[in-house]
Amino acid sequence: MSKITEVVESIALPIVERENMELVDVEFVKEGPDWFLRVYIDKPGGVDLDDCVNINEQLSEKLNETDPIEQAYYLDVSSPGAERPLKKPSDFERAVGKNVYMKTFAPIDGAKEFEGILTAYDGETVVIETRIKTRKKAVSLPVDKIAQARLAVTFS
């Protein structure tokens, strides 16, 4: 996590929690010539446009007061979407029983990408039940070896 995202997270967290929401993630990325500060929020039942506007206005005011970012940027507050990232222990716990996609830093059992049902999480390891052709296989992945993890939408 970069220093900017850490500072923004410390500013955004009290605002989001005061509104009984969860701060899912903060990203500060350059796309073409422009910088984007993306803040992802959620709550049980999901967030709507009014929630995003409310947090955007409060956060924008605080960011203007503290001015932690030197360059010009666009502030974007939104839901994490259907393919929500899994970063915190609570994200993994909530995802047990759901379809997930994970990518590891190095190959595990000959692969770096895994998609399937997250069947277990113990704080250090996740177990994903993947399907290889017609066989099901359980793969254990140490959390510290996971480069990217998110929910995965499936169309049946």
Swiss-Prot record:
Any one GO BP annotation for this protein: ribosomal small subunit assembly
Keyword Lipoprotein among record annotations: no
Principal location class: cytoplasm
Annotated localization: Cytoplasm
Gene Ontology cellular component terms for the protein in this record: cytosol
Family listed: Belongs to the RimP family.
Highest taxon in the source lineage: Bacteria
Gene name as annotated: rimP
Pfam families: DUF150_C, RimP_N
Role according to the record: Required for maturation of 30S ribosomal subunits.
Database matches in PANTHER family: RIBOSOME MATURATION FACTOR RIMP (PTHR33867:SF1)
Name of this protein: Ribosome maturation factor RimP
Organism this protein belongs to: Exiguobacterium sp. (strain ATCC BAA-1283 / AT1b)
InterPro entries referenced in this protein's UniProt entry, alphabetically: Ribosome_maturation_RimP, RimP_C, RimP_C_sf, RimP_N, RimP_N_sf
Entry keywords, A to Z: Cytoplasm, Ribosome biogenesis
